[in-house]
Amino acid sequence: MVKKIIFILYILVLVCMAAATIVEKSQGTDYAHAHYYGAWWFILIWAVLAALGAFYIIKRKVKCASTLALHLSFIIILAGALLTHISAKRGMIHLRIGQPTDTYMAQDEEQGMKEEKLPFSLCLKKFEAKMHDGTNAVADYSSKFTVIDGDDKSEGEVSMNNIYSHRSYRLYQSSYDEDGKGSVLAINADPYGIPVTYTGYALLFISLVWMLFDPKGGYRKLLKSPLLKKGALITALILSMGNIQTLHAESATGNLQNAVLPKETAEKFGELHILYNDRICPVQTFALDFCKKIYGARSYQGLTAEQVLSGWVFYGNTWANEPFIKIKSGEMKTAMNLPDYASLNTFFNREMGGYTIGQYVQEYYNGQQDKFHQQAADIDGKIQIIMELREGVSLKVLPYTFTKNVKATKNHPFIKAGTTTWFSPVDKLPQAVEQQHALYIKNVFSLLNGDVKAGNISRVNEFFVKMKKYQEVSSGNSLPTATQYKAERINNAFPFATILFMANLTLGFIALFYTIYRMTKKREIKVLNIALPILLGVSFLALTFGLALRWIISGNIPMSNGYESMLTVAWFVMLISILMQLRIRIVMVFGFLISGFFLLVSHINQMDPAIGQMMPVLNSPLLSIHVSIIMMSYALLSLTFICGIMGICLRSHGEELQALSRIFLYPALTTMGFGIFIGAIWANVSWGNYWSWDSKETWALITFMIYAVVVHTQSLPVFRKPLVYHIYITLAFLSIAMTYFGVNYFLTG
C-alpha cells in the first residue's frame, strides 16, 4: 500500500512540475510560483513523499550504504529548501552614489514588494561597467560601496559572480542606472537553508560516485553480468536520413563577371578586422555569416564569401538583381509566388508602393504573428542585413583610441580615456576624434570605391594593406591576439560540423553493416577491425581540434549556444565510445551514428554557429562545469535510447541490450545529478537563489526523476522485464528532447 502511494505521489509531482512550466508560459512567472511551486499543497506533496520514502526504506531494511546515503541526501536537500522557503529574506536595494541607504524592497508572497530595514547602511562610491576592448559588449559590472554598521565602516565590492557578505546578508550585482551613478543589488539572507542544502548537495555528490563503486551496489554487479560477455548481439537498427539539399558550386554568371573583386584582393579584404557580433574578428568571419544567413551557403556560384561581401559593398546595384536571398517554404512564398532564391529588387517595386512586404512586416510587429507574417519578418531581417551593408552601417572596420575623457552627448555616451571605439564610414564621430583620423574614417571607403570602379586593383590591394596597418596602430588593446586570429582563420576554412557529420554517419553505417555481417557470418574482416577504431579516434581528434579553436577564439569554454553544445555532446559520445569499445565492440557503432546525428543537428541552419561574447553572469567556471557534465549525461542517455529502440526491434536480444543500456544509465544519472546541483550552486553564487524553478532546471529535474525510476528494480520488479524496460527508456528520451529543445522553443519568450 505504501509503495502504491509513493508511486502515485511521485507521478503527481512530475505532472505538477510539468504543468507549472506550461502555466508559467501563459500566466507568467509570479503566477506559477504563487499557485504551484510555492503553494502549500505542492510543499505538502513533497513532504509526504519524502516521509513515506524514508519509512519504506526503513521498512524494507535496506542495507546498501550508498543507497541509504543517496536517499538521505534528497531528504536533507528538501529540508534545506523548506528552511529557505520559511526563513530566507530576499529583495533589491537601490544605491545612488554618495547617498547612504538602509532599506531594501523585500519580496512578499502576499503583498508583492514591501520595504524592509537593514541592520546596517550602504553608501555607493562607484559603479563601473567594464567593456570588452573595442566593443560595446559588457565584460563585467562592479559596484564599490561603504558598509556603515554602527561605528564601524568597511569597504565592499560586488561584481558578476562575485558576492559580498556582511552578517547573514549576501549582496549580488543585479542592475544599474542608465546614467552610471546608481546600482541595484540583490539581497539574500538565508543563514539556515543554504548550509543544510549544501550539506545535502555534498552527500548527494559523494553517494552518486559511491553508487558506481560500491561492491554491494547494483552497478558493480551489472558490470560482472555474463550477458555483457555474450557475442550474440545481432544489430538490426534501421536508420534513414532525409534528403539533404546541397548547393553545387557554379561559375559566376555573366552579370557578375565585372561585379566582383579578384579572389586574392577579396582575401585581403577578409584579412581586415571588424567589430561584429560584439567582438573583434576577421572580416572573413562576417562575410561567411553574411552568406550563410542570406543565401544559406558559405559561397555563391563559385565565389568566396569575401568576394560576395565585397561585391555587395562596391557593386551593390548589380548584386541587387542576383537571386541571393533564400526563401524558405511557407505561406508567404506560396501566396506571392516567390522562387527558392529571390533578388533584393524583387521586394522593391514602385508600382506596388515601394517595399512590397513592408505592410506585412508592420502587421507582424503589431501582433499578427501567424506563419505568413513570420516569414515576412524573416525575409525582412535578411533584407535589413543587406541594406545595412550597402549603407556602410555594418562596416565597423575603422578603430580610434581616445586619449582623453569625452563627455556624453545625444550622439554618444561618456567615453573614458584609453577606450577604443570601432567606427563605420557613416558613423557620426565625436568631436574629440583627431582631424586626420576623422578624415581617414570618413573618406577611405569613398577613395577605395573610386579605385574599384576604375579597375585599379593594385591600388585597391595597397588600400587594404594600409588599412590593416591603420587598424594595428589605432586599435589600442582591442585586437585579438595573433594566436586567436590564426585560430579563427583556420576555423573559418574548415566547417568541422559539416565534414564530421558526413564522415561519422558514413562510417557508422559501414560499422553497422559490418557488425551484422560479423555476427551472422561469424567472420572477421581484419582491415575493418583495425581501421574503424582508428577512424573514430581521428574523428574525435578533429572535433577536439575544432572545439579547441572555438575556445581559443572566444576565450570561453565552447558551450555558450545551441551549436556549440551539440558539438560538445557529440564529443562526449565519441569519448565514451572510445573508452568502452574495447570491452563492448558494438559501442563503436553507436559512437559513430549518434555523434554523427548530433553533428548533423549542429549543421542545420536552425542553430547559429556565430561566436560571440558571453554575458557577464555566464562567465563562470561553475557554469562551464555544470554544462559539461549535463552534456555528458545527455550523451550517455542517448546511448540508452538507441539500446531501447534496438531492444524493441530485436526482442531475442532484449536481455543483453538491457544490460548494456543499464551500463550507460547509472553513470548518466550520476553525471546528471552532478550537473543539476552544480548548476544550483552556480545560480546561488551568481544571483543568490539556488533553485528558482526556472523551466530549464525544472525539466532537468523531471528528466532526472523519470530516468531514476528504472533503477529501482527491487521495488518495481516490472522493469526487470527487458521489453518493459526498453519501451520505458525509449519514451523517457522525450523528456530530454523537452529539456533541451522544448523549453528553448516553446516555453521561453
Regions found by a protein language model. Name each.
Residues 1-749:
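Solvent-exposed, non-transmembrane regions of integral membrane proteins
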